[in-house]
């Protein structure tokens, strides 16, 4: 049976969706999995750079995903949905609530929860690299209040969030790679002593291999949140299907 997945880019930047699609198609076999892509409407912000734009993007996208049963993006037409924004994005909770209310057989995953849960399981020191500075307190608060396990806290494995001081849409520009790499080396690797660096924005998608090669001698694992989010989502779907 074909597995149907919807990847939701909640901002209105089509270039971001194209980048996500390119990364996913390089990483995943599509033989038994059909992946569709949704870009936020024009009323959604072009980039999500904090709480206000997160809420605006949720308000713009949610009706298109849960209200119109004729839409190709209607949530119950999919086995799983990946919200491709690295935050505690309100779309995740809203769609989960609707799915639970209607007893819909669909798994919903966000990039933040899947990444932190992976790091909790691995049990190594980890930190986040993000875009603009506004995200530092937002991500730190979300991680510390909702997603850490007791083991992670007790062993002091969570090291915090670092900003590149770049806007989301600038993260993928080749001319900014050296700046990003220098910040990661100075802050995430040397100062915070991270074994895992979470690439904490969908704008980093596709940079995992380049960063891994750059810091090969340090042995640092760079976690592509799109890749780990999709892997976890597919595993959840397969488990649900195995129980039928």
From Swiss-Prot:
Q: Where does the signal peptide begin and end?
A: none
> A GO molecular-function term, please?
amino-acid racemase activity
Q: Outline the inducing conditions.
A: Expression is regulated by various nitrogen sources.
* One family name in Pfam for this protein: Asp_Glu_race
Q: What does the record's miscellaneous section state?
A: Sensitive to nitrogen catabolite repression.
Family listed: Belongs to the HyuE racemase family.
Protein name according to UniProt: Protein DCG1
